[in-house]
Amino acid sequence: MTANLLDFDLDGLAVFCERLGEKRYRAVQLFRWIHQKGASNFDDMSDLAKSLREKLKVSAQVKAPDLISQHISSDGTIKWLFDVGGGDAVEAVFIPEEDRGTLCISSQAGCAMGCRFCSTGHQGFSRNLKTGEIIAQLWFAEHFLRKHLQRDERVISNVVMMGMGEPLQNYAELVPALRAMLDDHGYGLSRRRVTVSTSGVVPMMDRLARDCPVALAVSLHAPNDLLRDDLVPLNKKYSLAELLNACNRYLAYAPRDFITFEYCMLEDVNDQPEHAQQLVRLVQHYSSGGVWCKFNLIPFNPFPASGLTRSTPERIQAFAKILSDAGIVTTIRKTRGDDIDAACGQLAGEVKDRTRVGERIARQRTFMLKPVSEINTQVKEN
């Protein structure tokens, strides 16, 4: 069976090379060719022995999902749609700024979380992405942008796992992809510049802290369990108390000294002054005295059939002021790419086979009921 080399972190690639009778340093060379130079043709890898190149031609490939479409926003944001087979497609979004280039990556086709304000959740869950399908989004985007912008140096400085899916429900495939992003022979990204966003899969937050502690963002969206049960159904499994305690445990390993809480601003749902005051009390209750979190307020990005409305700018500003006045670092996310449905909460994948939506929703319900022991959490040993 032909192996896709994008599925391996460096250690996995070293094991693969050993099976071919090659030394570890060959894996380093190969890893650099793939991730730093964007090579997919083994004949282009000129410092590899010809004998190794011939072995690779019959046993391996470097294969990213096919690109279906590209959309460029008026603000420079780029959205790519990738075909991952079986009628499924996933999206990645590049957000250019003066001091950074951020890529938003998907981890699943669809999502099992069912958050009310998220278009992906309304699509339902289809399947987990493989490691190669996750890292291929960065591999494609980085080398496409270098060629397009005629630059030799790195274009993407930050990666956020905030695209389609719940990353921590795909733990075994996620971690090797994160390691490839961080590896100096790969993309060499700082742990501070790679962020995993989670709805609050508490046991996997603890695992990530030990295995690959990158920056953490938590989709909070509500100041109490009653409201969060409605907006983020996973809260019925892991309450705010369990989630906030897990956040404090994560801080001991985190590359930053704070956790980011994401809070989608929904008119007349979670945007009242009393909600902000409840958040202040919640944060203070779990604080050990210092600043341990920041809030990122996200204006809701509407999509059909959501039944929700974006809070007014005035209400968002007033909400932010209550948090800031309490000493909580608070930012308001600038909406980017909403004219191409690339803004936060809008990624739905434009799945080619729309006839399977009912099947996906049923699979979503089943997936949500699984105990953690049945979720794919075993990091691959190659």
Swiss-Prot record:
PROSITE patterns: RADICAL_SAM. It comes from the Bacteria. S-adenosyl-L-methionine binds at residues 165-166, 197, 219-221, 301. Binds 1 [4Fe-4S] cluster. The cluster is coordinated with 3 cysteines and an exchangeable S-adenosyl-L-methionine. Its EC number is 2.1.1.192. It catalyses: adenosine(2503) in 23S rRNA + 2 reduced [2Fe-2S]-[ferredoxin] + 2 S-adenosyl-L-methionine = 2-methyladenosine(2503) in 23S rRNA + 5'-deoxyadenosine + L-methionine + 2 oxidized [2Fe-2S]-[ferredoxin] + S-adenosyl-L-homocysteine; adenosine(37) in tRNA + 2 reduced [2Fe-2S]-[ferredoxin] + 2 S-adenosyl-L-methionine = 2-methyladenosine(37) in tRNA + 5'-deoxyadenosine + L-methionine + 2 oxidized [2Fe-2S]-[ferredoxin] + S-adenosyl-L-homocysteine. GO terms for biological process: rRNA base methylation; tRNA methylation. GO terms for molecular function: 4 iron, 4 sulfur cluster binding; metal ion binding; rRNA (adenine(2503)-C2-)-methyltransferase activity; rRNA binding; tRNA (adenine(37)-C2)-methyltransferase activity; tRNA binding. Residues 97-339 form the Radical SAM core domain. Keywords: 4Fe-4S, Cytoplasm, Disulfide bond, Iron, Iron-sulfur, Metal-binding, Methyltransferase, rRNA processing, S-adenosyl-L-methionine, Transferase, tRNA processing. Pfam families: Radical_SAM, RlmN_N. Its cofactor is [4Fe-4S] cluster. One of its GO terms (cellular component) is cytoplasm. The active site is at residues 91, 344. Disulfide bonds join 104-344. [4Fe-4S] cluster binds at residues 111, 115, 118. Its main location: cytoplasm. InterPro entries: Aldolase_TIM (IPR013785), Methyltransferase_A (IPR040072), RlmN_N (IPR048641), RNA_MTrfase_RlmN (IPR027492), rRNA_lsu_MTrfase_RlmN/Cfr (IPR004383), rSAM (IPR007197). It is found in: Cytoplasm. The keyword Transferase applies. SUPFAM superfamilies: Radical SAM enzymes. Reaction proceeds by a ping-pong mechanism involving intermediate methylation of a conserved cysteine residue. Belongs to the radical SAM superfamily. RlmN family. Specifically methylates position 2 of adenine 2503 in 23S rRNA and position 2 of adenine 37 in tRNAs. m2A2503 modification seems to play a crucial role in the proofreading step occurring at the peptidyl transferase center and thus would serve to optimize ribosomal fidelity. This is Dual-specificity RNA methyltransferase RlmN.
